Amino acid sequence: MIAAVAAGCGGAQSSDVAKDRIETVGVEQFAELMTRKDVRLIDVRTPKEYAEGHLEGSENIDVKATDFAEHIKDIKGTVAVYCRSGKRSLTAAVQLSTNGCSVYNLDGGILAWQKAGRKTTTIETDIFSTRNGKLVKIHALMHACIRIEYDGREIEVDPCANLNGRTVDYSAFPKADIILVTHDHFDHFDTATINMLSTEKTLLVMNRACAEKMDGKRMDNGDKLSVGTDISIEAVPAYNTTKGHQQFHPKKRDNGYILCLDGLRIYMAGDTEDIPEMSKVKNIDIAFLPCNQPYTMTPEQLVRAAKIVKPKVLFPYHYSETDVTGIAEQLPDIDVRIRHYE
């Protein structure tokens, strides 16, 4: 256990009890912790440092940010933290342990990790908790490609390995338990990647156009599907409304999806504009809304859509070269997160 350090914030736990919840561990033990589905991995460095390379599956919460305490107040359970050398993460560990978490701190930080020959990644990760405390990790791959880890299961959305010079090495990921495909355009429907990710047990969900080209579970707008007791999938409309654009995504052909994981509701809108049917999309925790004309929405349309859906967290995606940096200031009541979904 660590030596006494000054507590970084107040809390119900005494400082001595909080310190007993912290353990500083080496690279090998930290790597083992990263394989556990109940451990939340946090990089407490700056966003710039995180973007340059981080441990796979880690989310970024800057311990030096003024809102750090706000960001961690609802985090429970077991947490593994790291920084550059281990000092900032120790400060973060104290605050997390004061909140009741059991915390493991990486001795020597990412420098020790790299010295040991361990790999890092630039794929951004956001972590959420379900109603029963299960962790959901959402990895921003590119464009409309989303990887979701939930309770030991792998979910891939519109997997595409190569797009305009950007690539995703799907061979580095586990096989998929569920694959969701919104429609049959090349930047969403990559049959080679789907085949590579699939096993005989993989549930492949597609719209009608894709199901005509590849074996899978066809879902039309309005269809619902339960997967076990804790996962449900609903196909919802996704289409163009602007005059001269309707041919890109005709009404009733393509899908968006509402994926519910143990009560956590995730809306992946697919290629769509701000359509009337969005008013029926309710109680959304996390929304992915597309932003690039002429194929999907303008930033103004995206803002309108967000005000209709009212998600707690919003990820603009599929935005290519569209400037989405001004969206957050127009949606002060929504946690807007810009990730590399160009």
Model-flagged regions — what are they?
Residues 1, 6-33, 47-78, 84-125:
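Rhodanese-like catalytic fold shared by cysteine-dependent sulfurtransferases
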Residues 49, 242-308, 320:
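Active-site-proximal loop/helix segments of hydrolase catalytic cores
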Residues 128-131, 145-184, 191-195, 242-247, ...:
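Pre-active-site segment of Zn-dependent metallo-hydrolases
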Residues 124-135, 141, 206-264, 338-342:
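Metallo-beta-lactamase
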Residues 83, 156-160, 176-187, 204-208, ...:
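Active-site neighborhood of phospho(di)ester-bond hydrolases with catalytic His/Asp-centered motifs
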Residues 11, 123-151, 330-333:
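Zn-dependent metallo-beta-lactamase
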Residues 167-226, 234-239:
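Active-site HxH/HxHxD metal-binding segment of metal-dependent hydrolases
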Residues 217-228, 251, 303, 307-342:
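Binuclear metal-ion centers of metallo-dependent hydrolases, dominated by the metallo-beta-lactamase
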